[in-house]
A protein has these predicted regions:
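Preferential activation on post-signal-peptide N-terminal prodomains/segments
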Residues: 1-102
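Residues in well-ordered beta-strands of folded domains
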Residues: 20, 138-140, 164
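Charged, low-complexity helical/coil segments in non-catalytic cytosolic or luminal regions
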Residues: 63, 84, 89-151, 156
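Short, surface-exposed beta-strand/loop "edge" segments at domain boundaries and coil↔beta transitions
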Residues: 97-99, 168-173
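A broadly conserved detector of short glycine/acidic/proline-rich loop/turn motifs that flank catalytic sites
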Residues: 143, 167, 176
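Conserved histidines in hydrophobic membrane contexts and catalytic metal-binding motifs
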Residues: 159-164, 172-177
Length: 177
């Protein structure tokens, strides 16, 4: 066998191997996506069993995000800034502009919106507000102002799932345990 035939055989073998590996990867991705959709449907059924209506579509994408270090500008209005396409928000009535400064060193895996919905419902400990209807679900960077003083200059924003219902906002930390 000469060298050119050997090279051709090796190239064909590598191409076939790449095609097989790509097919296995896509198959696994589709299965994972289907499982996340089933988990979202299951979480909606769980919510409805607990008396919570879910009219919003639960996101099924899986992300990794870092924490975000922010500073507060008390002279500015309540302008909402974004970081990586996600709004940076604070719980409560913070009368300051939240300015993204820098990211943490490592990206953390986030829980699915379906798991966050179950955590939200379980957090009510059996006293779910009457007529609770989840109208919107979104991923945000969240500053929990209940843990810091009103005159703080800096804080940490974490990825969180925000659930909106009739003007009320509920935040569930999105980092996996």
């Amino acid at each position: 066998m000469d060298w050119s035939k050997a090279k051709t055989i090796i190239i064909i073998a590598l191409l076939v191997t790449n095609l097989l590996m790509g097919g296995f990867y896509l198959s696994g991705y589709r299965e994972d996506l289907q499982q996340r959709r089933l988990a979202a449907d299951s979480a909606v059924r769980y919510a409805e069993q607990r008396g919570v209506s879910v009219s919003a579509e639960l996101p099924v994408d899986q992300k990794k995000l870092p924490v975000l270090f922010v500073s507060f500008n008390y002279d500015g209005g309540g302008e909402v800034h974004t970081h990586k396409g996600l709004p940076v928000e604070a719980s409560g009535d913070l009368d300051a502009e939240i300015l993204p400064e820098s990211e943490g060193d490592t990206d953390g895996l986030l829980i699915a919106a379906s798991k966050a919905l179950v955590k939200l419902i379980d957090g009510f400990e059996g006293s779910v507000p009457q007529g609770l209807d989840i109208e919107k679900v979104s991923l945000v960077y969240w500053v929990d102002t209940s843990l810091s003083s009103e005159s703080a200059l800096e804080d940490t924003a974490i990825p969180a799932w925000k659930f909106e219902s009739g003007g009320n906002r509920y935040y569930i930390e999105a980092f996996a345990e």
